[in-house]
Amino acid sequence: MKYMLLIYSNPANWAALPEAEQGGLMGEYGAFTKEITESGEFVSGDPLSDTSTASTVRVRAGSTDVNDGPFIESKEHMGGYLLVECDSLERATEIAARLPEAQYDPIEVRRIMDRVEFGMEAQ
């Protein structure tokens, strides 16, 4: 099964860390990613740009409205994601708990449904 690990971050938490600790966490992240890549569980993952570069798109009555910024105001925002493939929700949550970010910010774990399960024909 595939699981999306949504990494929420608060930039103030990162900024409050000493530079050496930031570097250490980046090293941990690299080692962690290597480990789950070698185990075959890593599918993809990337950081997201700051919310100041975001746009929100809404279509109402055939009209497209594009606004700068995220949909909601919050101290935490989605900062990145990991897509993993593993046998169970339990394993996905174990992987999420090992993300260095989990020490400071929440990680949301969601199973990805396949098209048939969602009610769409497989294509």
What is each of the regions a protein language model found here?
Residues 1-123:
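Conserved, structured core segments of small domains
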